[in-house]
Amino acid sequence: MSLSLEFFILSGAPKAVERFTESAAGATVTVVRRETLAADVNAAVAASTADYVCVVDGDGVLAPGALATLSTFVHQHPDATVVYSDEAVKVRGKRRPATVAKPIFSPERLRCQFYFGDLVLYSRALFTELGGLDATLPGAELYDLALRASLVSSSIEHISSPLFVRPVPRVIDLDATAVASTRRALETHLAASGGGEIVSIGVDGVHDTRRLVVGEPLISIIIPSRGIHSVSDGVSTCYVLDAVRGIVEKSTYTNYEFVIVLDSVAEPEVVEELRLIAGDKFVKVDWNKPFNFSDKINLGAIHARGEYVLLLNDDVDLITPGWLESMLALAQRPNAGMVGAMLYFGDETIQHAGHGYYENDASHIGLDADHDDPGPLDGHRVEREVSGVTAACALMPTAVFHEVGGLTNLLPGNFNDVDLCMKTTWLGYDIYWTPHAELYHFESKTRDASVHSSEVDIAWGRWSFRMHDPKYWPYPHNRPPG
């Protein structure tokens, strides 16, 4: 099987062009000028007879066997109109390059960064349908093409093999022209994909773009709590009071209610103070059984009036005032099932940037990383699709919560959120994560956090066949390989 493919490589150092051409032996390679990139490529594609075209803007070469891999892949995926792959970077002192793994097609992530990389194949038919590269967007032509393709292509495919090898890590440093072009490209994309706003364009290629909330729907914040004071580090505190007070004082979104499921041991003065803090937003639900987080959440959902339910632990402290807007805007996406937040431990390290399921392991993305750790491919900095999120802070459309059956009471303390996420994606819904909803989470300060073997047996008994799900986070133990 041969692949009908034409590469267009930007003119640069003659040796770099020569190295790439040698690595692409068997395919047509045409050199184009950066100054007239769009015009040169569009004219060349118009004259081309290749089935696929690829513009290479980077110093690197195809990995050995890359063309054969691409050929096999497109023959196995004849409907693919966009194909991109993992990459590799040579590391000084090491024989093998380091792999730069990428997620599968992630539309919300794409509006925040052009993560496709240097090797992106477009079917010539799609390239022509899109009108080719836009000459009015110098410095952002390739990103703009990917954004436009994402709105019309029904098959954007990822090859989880490093087919492009760079001699050094790619460093993105957009000049003023490229920043302006990127802004215009993203403005057009957001307008065509449901709306949104651009907070900032990053010269490093990471852009703060956000969806916008439609209307002002009621959010029911469901908080299971014992409702008592406890001593932590020698100080008596009541976590649910602190959590509710922080939300009331800091949140910029105000159409919410607190559905607080309180144990029978709840202190009367705590209940009274909750009423004082939350006023008519406070809904008290009584709980008279042994601890079961799942059952308490489900009971709270029965009493919830909101169009959306926010599952929330009582041992949290809000950081970002606009957290509800950031989560709600994603929860309003057409196929949204759940949205998670960025959680930090009290020592400022990351606790949660999404769930990662890898090689039969379920764990938190970013666990124990430094507060400002950007994550592999800047994954801690961008809104993105994920395989799951923690129920310590998760927003769901109420209808979806009930459709999936809520949380299973067979998992009273652990892995109930894993099960909930699995059920949500099993029914075809998308799960998102945002770094713009930030909270401290004082991990299980008010309950026994031990994991029981029965919980492992139940969760893995149900979902072990899906406990390797590297689509959106392709890193073992949620760390990049290296």
What is each stretch, according to the model?
Residues V53, V309:
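Short aromatic/hydrophobic "clamp" motif used to bind/position activated sugar donors
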Residues R96-A125, D295-K296, Y358-A399:
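A recurrent flexible, glycine/aromatic-enriched loop bordering the glycosyltransferase active site
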